C-alpha cells in the first residue's frame, strides 16, 4: 500500500484556510504600494529567470511599467489575471459588477463557498495579490465608463455585450496612444478571442527566436551572389529573410552592415539579392546573421472587423469551416442575451431553437459571406452549454489572452490577428445527454454538469488518477483537477508525486507556492494548496521519484487500480519510464510539455493511439570535443567549456582529493589497476591540489586564480598558435585556420579591466571555499585593494614547447592520449602522492563545490561567465552578460505561465474523454502551439503500428499471457501453435534459453520461473503473480517476427 498522507494534508489545509480567512500572509495595500515604489525597473532575476529566458530584459521593463484592466472575474478573467500577476505587470485592476455564485466555483480557483454573495472582483483581490507582491492588484466595481479605460495600457473584457464592446473598442482604438483592447469569451466548450492593438502597432520581435547565423565558406562574384556556408549546421534562413555580414575577408564590401535579402535558401547555401561582380574576391571568413526588422500591424476596430473579419486564425484543420460558423454563433448568443437578459437554459429546446433562429437571421444579412449551411447540431451544443465557464477552457484561453496582453504591453511576439475561435465539442460524452441530466444540483460543479451531465460528473469524482510531477505543469493540473471535481468523492483518489523541493525561481510560474514554502517538498505544498481550492479533493502527496527503484511503492496493485495517468514532467527519461508503465498496465497517459512560448500535448490511449516512446525528437547535436576545447566558434562552445572547467577544478578534483584521503590504499590500488591515461590525469590533479597549487591563505587563492588566468587565456593560446601558426596548412593543402575555425589571440591581463579582475576575484573566492579558507570582504567587489593583491602575483614568462599534441580529430572522445609508459608514470605519481600526503595536517579535507545556477550571491556564475567571456575574447566571439551565460551554461529551460496554462487546459479537455470512455481515436486531439507567432496545430493522434502474422495481429498495447506455471518446453509449444518458432527467451538482461546452446536444452523441462530465479537471480515480489519474458521468434520462412511481451502466470 502507498504511504497515506491524507491526515497531514488535511491538517495543513485547515491551517491555511484559517490564515486565508484571517488575511495572514497576504500583502496589505500599503505593503503593495511600498513594493511597487521600491521596485522601479529592477528585475528580480532569481524570481523571473525562466521568464527572462523567454522575454529578455528589453521586454520585461516595459511589461513592468504596464497597467492592465481585466473585466469579468468568472473563470476566464481569473486565469488571465493570474497569468498577468505572475508575469509581473505594474498593476492589474479587476472589474466585475456581479456577485459570486456557487456556479463560479467550477472555474475560478480564487473563490470558495465562503465568498458566495460577495463582489467577484473584491473576492479575488487579496488572493491575486499574494501571487506577486510587486504587482499592485485592485478592484473596480459598478459601471465601467470609457474614462476609466484611459489609465490602462491594455484592457481585457471576458463578459461584455457586443454593443458595449464596440463602444469601448472605438474609444481605445482612437485613444492617443492607443489602448490595446482584447475581448475573449468562454462559453461551454467554445471560446473566442478578438484583439485590437490600435491603428498601427509595432512588433519589435515577431517570433522571439534568436537570429539565425551561418559561417561563410565562399561567396561568388556574381549577380545574384551565391553564398555557401560550412556544413557543420544546416542554415535556417528562409526566402525573403534579411541578413548582414561581418568578418568577411576579401569581399569586404559586405561588411558595411547593410541588410540584404536572401532568396533560394537551401540547407547550406543561398543566393543574395546583390550584384557582387565588382566586389573584391572572397578570401576567407565571414559570419552571416539574420536581421529581424520591426513589423507594423494595422488593426481594424471591432465594429469594422465584425462585418469584415478577414481570415480567421485556424487551429484544427479538420474543422476548416468552423470559425465562420462560430463567428455567427457568438453574435447569435449576444443577441439572445441582449433581448432576454440571460443565457439559454441547458437542455432547453426552446432556448436552443431561438439561438439557431438568431444565427439564421444574422446569416441572411451577410451577403457574399453568407454561409451555405448551418450546422444546427453544433449550434445546439453551443447554446445549451453557453452559460458555463469550464475550467479547462478558461485555463487554455487564459493562457492565450494573457500572452496577448504581454505582447500589447511589450511589442514582443506577433499579436493574434484578429479573431480566433476554438471548440472541443468532441469532449462531450458519446451518448446523447438528456435534459434532466443537465439540471443543476446546487453544487459547485453545476456549470460543468450543465455541459457534460451528472453521470460524467460522478465518474470524474470517483476517478483514480496518478499525477507525476508537481512543478509548473503540476500546479496548473492540480488547480484544474480540483475545480473539475476529479477524485473528489470518497471513492476517488489523486496521487501526486515529486521528489523536488521549492526554489525561489519556481514562484513566477508555480503559483500554488509562496515565499514561505521555499525548501519544502513540492508535492506536499501543492496538494495542500489544491485542497484549499476544493476541500473535498482526495489527494495523496508523495516524495518518491517514479522509477524502476520505486516499483515497491508504485506496485502492480497501484497501477492496476488507476483510471488515468497525467504527466507533469520536465525530462524525457522520466516520460519514457511512465510511458512504459502505462503501456504495460494499459492505462491512458495524458502527456504535455512546454518550452518558452511553445507547448505540446499528446494523448496516449490504450489500443487507440501510439505510445509516447513510439516517436521521439532527434538528440541535440553535440559539438565535438576538440571544437569545445581548442577551436570554439560561438559562445555556446565557450560556455560548455567554462562549465566543464568549473566542475573539474572546483568539484571533481576536490572530490578526488577526498576519495584519496578517505582511503589512500584503496585509491592507489584502483589507480594501479586502471593504469590508463585517465588514472594518470586524476593522480596529477590530486597532487597539484595538495602540493604545487595548495592554498593556505586567501592570497594563495588569488595567486592560483591569477596563474590560471595566464594559463587558460594566454599560455594555452600561445602554445596553440605556436603548434598551428596562422598560415598553417592541412595535409590536403587547405588552410588549417579556415571556417569554422577562428584564429585565437592571447588576452593580456590588466587589473584595471573590471571583467578580468572580477573573474579572478570570483575564482579566488571559490578556490578558498574548497580549502576552507576565510574570504576577505574586500575581495567580493573589484577595488584598489583587490587589484593590488592580484598585481603582486609573480607570473612566469611562457616558453612554447615543441611536439605538443593538440587533438584536432572531431571524432575524438578524450583529450588525454594513452602512452606506453603510463604504468611507470603512475608509479612515480603514486610515490609523489604518498610523500605529499605526509605533510597534510590531521583531518585535512577539501570542500567540493557543486554548481548552483540559481544563487546569484555564490559567485558560481561569475566564474563561469568570466571563463566563457575571456575565452570568447581569445577567439573574437561576442561576449555575453551573466544572465545570458546562466541560461546557456545552466541549461535553463525557458518557461512562462501562459503556455503552461494553455497546455494543461488542453490536456484536461482530453481527460473528459479518457474518463468518460467510448471515444474513438478521431475524437482525441494532440496539439502543438506556439503563442509567440501565434500558431495552433491540432490533429488526431496517430494510431499504433499493427504487426500481423497469419491470422494474428497485435500492437505495442498487447501483452500475451500464459497461465499454469508452465515449463520452457510448454512455452515453446504454446508459441508453435501460433505458427511461431521461438529461438531465444530472456528475462531482464539474462538469457533463459537459446536454441543455439546445447546445454540450454537441459532447461526445457524446468518451470520458466525456476530458470529465471536461478539464471537471472530474480526474486519475484510477493505481490506479483507473473513473470515477464521477451521471446525472439521466427516464422516458418525464417523471418523474424516481433511479438508482444509474454507474461507467464505461475501463482
Curated annotation (Swiss-Prot):
Biased composition (Basic and acidic residues): 1-32
Residues binding ATP: 472, 498, 509, 522, 570-571
Swiss-Prot/TrEMBL keywords: ATP-binding, Ligase, Nucleotide-binding, Repeat, Ubl conjugation pathway
Pathway as given in its UniProt record: Protein modification; protein ubiquitination
Region (2 approximate repeats): 56-605
A single GO cellular-component term on record: cytoplasm
EC number annotated for this UniProt entry: 6.2.1.45
Principal EC category: ligase
Region feature (Disordered): 1-42
Repeat region (Sequence), residues: 56-194, 453-605
One term of GO molecular function: ubiquitin activating enzyme activity
Subunit: Monomer.
Protein's job: Activates ubiquitin by first adenylating its C-terminal glycine residue with ATP, and thereafter linking this residue to the side chain of a cysteine residue in E1, yielding a ubiquitin-E1 thioester and free AMP.
NCBIfam families: Ube1
Protein name per the record: Ubiquitin-activating enzyme E1 2
Organism of this sequence: Triticum aestivum
